[in-house]
């Protein structure tokens, strides 16, 4: 009847009081003392449970993954002190009462947006001749965890991607990561380019497990990101419409160096990883030229299916990774396939369409995916299917004639900081669009101060999803952002003509 049975908070009450919830006991006993004074008392601290929640019928336990901290910056969030339970943790509770049973925190004192919300798979794994009930987990931080699901003991934590630099591994005696001290940018006061970045070595795109092969198939990716302490007042100030994560966004924007831009494209890649939890090694993998590929599905017929952000739908042999199918789907694929039977005939279905955080913020790192059209479509396949995709609409013409640069170097620099703080998460790094939201470099209002302001602060396009920043940005700030976007339009056209705006269809 919709009556609330129990509630479990993943972060403490900012006033230090009980919540009248199932989590009160464990916070009073252990979790609350892992938090120190900081901005979490204003922001809430984070800890959202937004993806994997699974039930173990045999043990009568409910497991859920907990998200990152808010703000990201642990130095601001909690004064740089404490593990901040239950951020970035797997938590087990009694499903009837919500009573805490156990937890394992994958990233203590989380500060890089390393959520632990990714998919939790229940399995049995033979270890030293004994079958153990375990959880498989491949979160953002790049390590594959095997956890005893009876009591939360860490069994193993091994990398499923290359290049991880925030930690070198895990100490199995303590269950804690062996961190690179440079990764805690708020302690060193120096920028840190982290691998993986905030978008993770594995994000929300589903992974799958095949009991026959014993392998887990992970849609992995390599997306480095720069982290720095917020230096400017713009980055420090919490804003109603701002991305309030407590890092300096300017570090993430590339310098005026075309080689750096092309290096960013080359460094941002995807990979299908077949991971063996028993050995802690990658059994096989297949490289992709871009990140943000679709989830995986594996079947009893020794198959693995996956769509890619470059618009291909692929099938591989599950044991060896031999490519068996590669079909052009006209649009990017971020969803996972599903399969079902009707009258004894098997079907495979999936959705096409670009979407999610990466195409919004990626900028140049979107690489080859930028020019793919965004076509939302349900595709259903079967053996012997005869249907064909309709022809693509004809490409439109992009008119890329940047306005005259009227802004001074000081105005452009100010606009860059403001763009990073207010605009980058929807309109892309360096104002390079990815075909998902408008590419501001070719905006029809870019050359007109008043028209630009009518959109940014006047709400002229609020019906299309562009909110007004009228209560947040001054007239001077809006104009400085325009000067910066004009600068990006002119510079990229001259130095990176291949980074033209996505072609309309």
Label each PLM-derived region with a short phrase.
Residues 1-39, 76-115, 123-131, 143-193, ...:
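Extracytoplasmic/lumenal domain signature
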Residues 54, 188-193, 199-225, 258:
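Long, low-complexity segments enriched in small/aliphatic residues
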Residues 65, 138, 219-221, 307, ...:
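Residue-level marker for isolated small/hydroxyl-bearing positions within beta-strands
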Residues 389-411, 424-443:
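His/Cys-centered metal/cofactor-coordination and adjacent catalytic loops
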Residues 394-410, 417-421, 464-505:
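Flexible coil segments in periplasmic/lumen-exposed cytochrome c-class electron-transfer proteins
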Residues 416, 428-469:
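Gly/Gly-Pro-rich "capping" loops immediately C-terminal to redox-active cysteine motifs
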């Amino acid at each position: 009847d919709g009556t609330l049975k129990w509630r479990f908070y993943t972060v403490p009450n900012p006033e230090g009081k009980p919540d009248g919830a199932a989590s009160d006991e464990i916070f009073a006993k252990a979790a609350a003392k892992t938090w120190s004074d900081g901005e979490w008392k204003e922001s809430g601290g984070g800890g959202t449970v937004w993806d994997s929640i699974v039930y173990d019928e045999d043990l009568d336990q409910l497991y859920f993954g907990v998200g990152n901290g808010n703000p990201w910056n642990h130095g601001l969030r909690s004064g740089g002190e404490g593990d901040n339970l239950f951020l970035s943790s797997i938590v087990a509770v009694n499903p009837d009462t919500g009573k805490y049973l156990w937890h394992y925190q994958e990233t203590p004192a989380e500060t890089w947006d390393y959520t632990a919300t990714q998919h939790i798979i229940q399995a049995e794994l033979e270890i030293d001749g004994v079958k153990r009930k375990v959880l498989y987990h491949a979160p953002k931080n790049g390590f594959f965890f095997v956890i005893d699901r009876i009591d939360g003991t860490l069994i193993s934590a091994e990398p499923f991607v290359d290049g991880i630099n925030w930690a070198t591994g895990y100490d199995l005696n303590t269950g804690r990561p062996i961190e690179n001290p440079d990764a805690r940018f708020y302690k060193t006061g120096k920028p840190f380019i982290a691998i993986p970045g905030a978008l993770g070595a594995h994000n929300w795109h589903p992974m799958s497990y095949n009991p026959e092969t014993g392998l887990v198939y992970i849609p992995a990716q390599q997306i480095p990101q720069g982290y720095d302490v917020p230096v400017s007042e713009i980055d420090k100030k919490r804003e109603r419409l701002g991305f309030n994560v407590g890092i300096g966004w300017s570090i993430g924007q590339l310098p005026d160096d075309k080689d750096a831009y092309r290096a960013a494209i080359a460094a941002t890649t995807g990979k299908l990883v077949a991971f063996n939890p028993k050995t802690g090694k990658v059994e096989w993998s297949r490289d992709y030229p871009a990140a943000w590929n679709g989830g995986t599905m594996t079947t009893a017929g020794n198959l693995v299916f996956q769509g890619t952000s470059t618009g291909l739908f692929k099938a591989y042999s599950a044991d060896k990774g031999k490519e068996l199918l590669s079909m052009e789907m006209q649009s990017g694929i971020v969803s996972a396939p599903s399969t079902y039977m009707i009258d004894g005939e098997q079907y495979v279905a999936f959705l096409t369409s670009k979407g999610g955080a990466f195409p919004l913020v990626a900028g140049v790192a979107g690489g080859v995916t930028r020019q793919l059209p965004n076509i939302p479509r349900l595709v259903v396949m079967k053996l012997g299917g005869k249907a064909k995709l309709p022809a693509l609409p004809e490409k439109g013409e992009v008119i890329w004639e940047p306005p005259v640069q009227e802004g001074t170097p000081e105005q452009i620099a100010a606009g860059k900081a403001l763009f990073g703080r207010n605009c980058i998460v929807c309109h892309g790094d360096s104002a390079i669009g990815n075909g998902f939201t408008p590419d501001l470099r070719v905006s029809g209002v870019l050359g007109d101060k008043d028209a630009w302001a009518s959109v940014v602060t006047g709400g002229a396009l609020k019906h299309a999803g562009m909110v007004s920043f009228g209560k947040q940005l001054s007239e001077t700030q809006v104009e400085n952002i325009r000067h910066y976007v004009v600068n990006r339009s002119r510079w990229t056209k001259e130095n990176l003509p291949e980074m033209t705006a996505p072609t309309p269809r």
